[in-house]
């Protein structure tokens, strides 16, 4: 509280940033230890968590007051007009301090108290068991074993304690390979496909330079290849552009020399580094925040940002992994520079395409814990949790979530969770409300004692499971083991509900999923009414349903009233302003064709015609 100079300011205006006539709401601004709160004259509340604030800008004084612009990491932008410059200056300085903490213990997670006891807290952290996940894959087995070489984090500080390696890999081979890899991140198992033994492994770039080699590293890659008896070769996928990898050779790093490694096939996939991605997102946000752009100007700005091209590059790399494993039955080793950014993206998305379990709500949590949290994606640096180097901030995990969202658009029946689930996870990688995403590796999290001092996000999401369920999800999709998305350019869309989720005045739309969920609720109510009517009919000796008996069955039921009037109503009346429903075009909603090994895109699910939602085949 020592950073808060002014706790309350009245007559503050909240501007609508897309209004052409400076439309605004007048209310009171409150500053607390954790949130900035605005309450307008109608008692509507706008809460902004301090940790969500990316930047605060105090503009030049105007005749109506002092402007204060706040940009948030969850893409909310708020524009306040504070009547007095002194109050604006106090709030500005307070937010600069409160939004950038110097140490982890000052983050919200360490003071957040959801009224759970220690047992509930412990059970929440035990919800995800990675040892059980590897057992689900059939590991350990005849070819793969659990190694204790990193039990004390002596081999690699940014890897988990438990590493799965080929059974033929000895401890000297593991240690030697670690010494030859950047940050000690040696090749280890990420995913094993049951029934074929083809595997996804991950590591960092080798310290090969132009001519250096390491026999232990060569032996480890050979052991990974032999752990898959179904194929005599394996792929090594370098996720960087080739020029970047060549440049790293001059610094004593680089990529594997195929002459030194037997039975490997090398592949570059060309995903740009964190600095390019950060710049691309900034360009995208500049386009999003511009007022009065024409449609052509918006699409031109979206194209020049390069954001969707980067999303496509990440998905293409994941598709390469899936095809190598399914079509060629080949194992794949993935790396970038240090193996915690692009490597996490590609390994997790490849696993998602291959394994339907990861497309369930619980499985998706397991996937994030396995390929992102346990393998040391630097969440705190990439999300700017602390006041650190801004050059380390990059939307790597945001890109992963956006790739998943694009998959849900092409395969709406294949995912148990909906868009709101992805948005909520994105909200909490920045909120610092839960301990899951704090720190940069498992060792650091253990030192912070996060499981004792903070709470896990996952049980809270599962408690609200109904809110995040996808009404289109089909259990039949569990039989579909592999997704093959189409990455033609027309399949990539601007994720409006991510980047404009707080701009309610900007072309308001009702989502197709919301419509279908409402239709499901109506159907359930009608089924209950039918059961009650059937029970009442049985009680009638002559089988005649009297008017009094009708009113005894849910007299207030809108569905029943409609049925009794013998009208042919619309399933869901939609106002003219809601006819433009996102995802209602043929390119937006697709079913899956399960007749083939890889699924394909399918025809429209829901269309709107004359204000009526209809199912189409």
UniProtKB/Swiss-Prot annotation:
GO biological process: endocytosis; phosphatidylinositol dephosphorylation
Residue segments, region Interaction with RAB1B: 2-141
Keyword annotations of the record: Cell membrane, Cell projection, Cytoplasm, Endocytosis, Endoplasmic reticulum, Hydrolase, Lipid metabolism, Membrane, Phosphoprotein
EC number: 3.1.3.95
Sequence ranges assigned to domain Myotubularin phosphatase in this UniProt record: 124-499
Residues where a 1,2-diacyl-sn-glycero-3-phospho-(1D-myo-inositol-3,5-bisphosphate) binds: 248, 273-274, 337-342, 378, 382
GO molecular function, one term: phosphatidylinositol-3-phosphate phosphatase activity
Localisation: Cytoplasm; Endoplasmic reticulum-Golgi intermediate compartment; Cell projection, Ruffle membrane; Endoplasmic reticulum
Modified residues annotated as Phosphoserine in this record: 557, 585, 607
Enzyme class label: hydrolase
Gene3D superfamilies: Pleckstrin-homology domain (PH domain)/Phosphotyrosine-binding domain (PTB)
Residues that hold a 1,2-diacyl-sn-glycero-3-phospho-(1D-myo-inositol-3-phosphate) according to the record: 248, 273-274, 337-342, 382
Phosphotyrosine: residues carrying this PTM: 108
Pfam (any one): Myotub-related
GO annotation, cellular component aspect: endoplasmic reticulum; endoplasmic reticulum-Golgi intermediate compartment; nuclear envelope; ruffle membrane
Organism superkingdom: Eukaryota
Membrane topology: Peripheral membrane protein
Alphabetized SMART domains for the sequence: PTPc_motif (SM00404)
Catalytic machinery residues: 336 (phosphocysteine intermediate)
Similarity comment: Belongs to the protein-tyrosine phosphatase family. Non-receptor class myotubularin subfamily.
Annotated domain remarks: The GRAM domain is required for cell membrane localization.
Subunit structure: Homodimer. Heterodimer (via C-terminus) with MTMR9 (via C-terminus). Interacts with ALKBH4. Interacts with KCNN4. Interacts (via GRAM domain) with RAB1B (in GDP-bound form); the interaction regulates MTMR6 recruitment to the endoplasmic reticulum-Golgi intermediate compartment.
Name of this chain's protein: Phosphatidylinositol-3,5-bisphosphate 3-phosphatase MTMR6
């Amino acid at each position: 509280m020592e950073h808060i100079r002014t706790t309350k300011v009245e007559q503050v205006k909240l501007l609508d940033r897309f209004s052409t006539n400076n439309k605004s709401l007048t209310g009171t601004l409150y500053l607390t230890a954790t949130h900035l709160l605005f309450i307008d004259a109608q008692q509507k509340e706008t809460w902004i968590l301090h940790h969500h604030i990316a930047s605060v800008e105090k503009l030049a004084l105007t005749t109506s007051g002092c402007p204060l612009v706040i940009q948030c990491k969850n893409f909310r932008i708020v524009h306040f007009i504070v009547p007095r410059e002194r109050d604006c200056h106090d709030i500005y300085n307070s937010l600069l301090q409160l939004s950038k903490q110097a140490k982890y213990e000052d983050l919200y997670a360490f003071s957040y108290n959801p009224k759970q006891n220690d047992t509930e807290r412990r059970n929440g952290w035990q919800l995800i068991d990675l040892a059980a996940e590897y057992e689900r894959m059939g590991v350990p087995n005849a070819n793969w074993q659990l190694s204790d070489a990193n039990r004390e984090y002596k081999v690699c500080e940014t890897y988990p304690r438990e590493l799965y390696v080929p059974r033929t890999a000895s401890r000297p081979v593991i240690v030697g390979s670690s010494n030859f890899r950047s940050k000690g991140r040696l090749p280890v198992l990420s995913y094993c496909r049951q029934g074929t033994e083809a595997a996804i492994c991950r590591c960092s770039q080798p310290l090969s330079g132009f001519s250096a080699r390491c026999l232990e590293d060569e032996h480890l890659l050979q052991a990974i290849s032999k752990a898959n008896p179904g194929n005599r070769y394996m792929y090594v996928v370098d996720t960087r552009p080739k020029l970047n990898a060549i440049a790293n050779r001059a610094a004593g790093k680089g990529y594997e020399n195929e002459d030194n490694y037997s039975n490997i096939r090398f592949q570059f996939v060309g995903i740009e580094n964190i600095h390019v991605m950060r710049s691309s997102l900034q360009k995208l946000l500049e386009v999003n925040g511009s007022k009065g752009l024409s449609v052509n100007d918006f699409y031109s700005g979206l194209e020049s940002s390069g954001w969707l091209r980067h999303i496509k590059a990440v998905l293409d790399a994941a598709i390469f992994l899936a095809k190598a494993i399914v079509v060629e039955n080949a194992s794949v080793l993935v790396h970038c520079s240090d193996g915690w950014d692009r490597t996490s993206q590609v390994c997790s998305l490849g696993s998602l395409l291959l394994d339907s379990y990861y497309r369930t709500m619980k499985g998706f949590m397991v996937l994030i814990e396995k390929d992102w949290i346990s393998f040391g994606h630097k969440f705190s640096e990439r999300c700017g949790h602390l006041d650190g180097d801004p050059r380390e901030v990059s939307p790597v995990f945001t890109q992963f979530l956006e790739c998943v969202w694009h998959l849900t658009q092409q395969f709406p029946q294949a995912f148990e969770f909906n868009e709101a689930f992805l948005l909520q996870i994105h909200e909490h990688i920045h909120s610092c409300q839960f301990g899951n995403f704090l720190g940069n590796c498992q060792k650091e999290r253990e030192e912070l004692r996060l499981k004792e001092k903070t709470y896990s996000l996952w049980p809270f999401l599962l408690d609200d499971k109904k809110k995040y369920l996808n009404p289109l999800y089909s259990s039949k999709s569990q039989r579909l083991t592999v997704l093959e998305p189409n990455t033609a350019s027309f399949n990539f869309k601007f994720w409006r509900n991510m980047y404009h989720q707080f701009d309610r005045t900007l072309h308001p739309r009702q989502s197709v999923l919301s419509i279908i969920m409402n239709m499901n609720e109506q159907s359930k109510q009608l089924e209950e009414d039918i059961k009650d009517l059937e029970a009442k009919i049985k009680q009638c000796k002559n089988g005649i349903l009297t008017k009094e008996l009708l009113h005894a069955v849910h007299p207030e039921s809108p569905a029943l009233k409609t049925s009794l009037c013998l009208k042919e109503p619309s399933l869901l009346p939609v106002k003219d302003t809601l006819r433009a429903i996102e995802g209602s075009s043929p390119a937006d909603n697709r079913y899956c064709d399960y007749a083939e090994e890889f699924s394909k895109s399918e025809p429209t699910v829901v269309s709107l015609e004359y204000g009526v939602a209809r199912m189409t085949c």
